[in-house]
Design a protein with these regions (language model features):
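Phosphate- and other anionic-substrate recognition elements at nucleic-acid/protein interfaces
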Residues: 1-28, 32-164
């Protein structure tokens, strides 16, 4: 099971393809102060940001994420993996992998990692375009989770079409 969290993109194609094509997926953008959260619809076509979760104890974090997964009846959890622009591990990569490992041990749904390079930049751009006066880091964190989820869903669709 641990090898699923070791590849540069987080997991192999087979694990991604094992995720059903319907059912909600929750994504997390792990940060040092808070976690951005996003969810997709049942058909995995649209995504939306959810309120952030402030970083606290592991027990509290797990409880909050379990509640979100339960409320949305999520089929999978995707964690953003912060890599450097050249694809190498960043300082935060080990922490993201550890969070994913802990969730994998504690949840009964698949937990996958998704390369999150440039997601914060894209999230800031989107927040600014929607409201140039918006400066909230919380908006950016949840929008980054949304970008991570959209990237994951695009990757999943691409793999499906290649294997059809």
């Amino acid at each position: 099971m641990a090898q699923e969290l070791e590849t540069p993109n987080g997991e192999d194609s087979q694990q991604i393809l094992s995720i059903p094509d319907s059912g909600r997926i929750v994504a997390i953008d792990p940060g040092t102060k808070r976690l951005g959260i996003a969810v997709c619809d049942e058909m995995q076509l649209t995504t939306r940001p959810l309120p952030i979760i402030e970083r606290s104890s592991w027990k509290e974090l797990l409880s909050r994420v379990k509640l979100i997964i339960s409320d949305f009846d999520a089929a999978a959890l995707v964690i953003g993996l912060p890599l450097n622009s050249d694809g190498t591990e960043s300082k935060m990569s080990a922490e993201a992998r550890e969070i994913a490992r802990k969730f994998k041990l504690s949840l009964e749904i698949p937990v996958l990692l998704q390369d999150e390079r440039v997601t914060t930049y894209e999230a800031r751009r989107r927040v600014w375009l929607s409201d140039p006066r918006a400066r909230s880091d919380e908006l950016v964190d949840s929008e980054a989770a949304r970008v991570i989820l959209e990237d994951f869903l695009d990757r999943k669709r691409s793999l499906r079409s290649k294997n059809s």
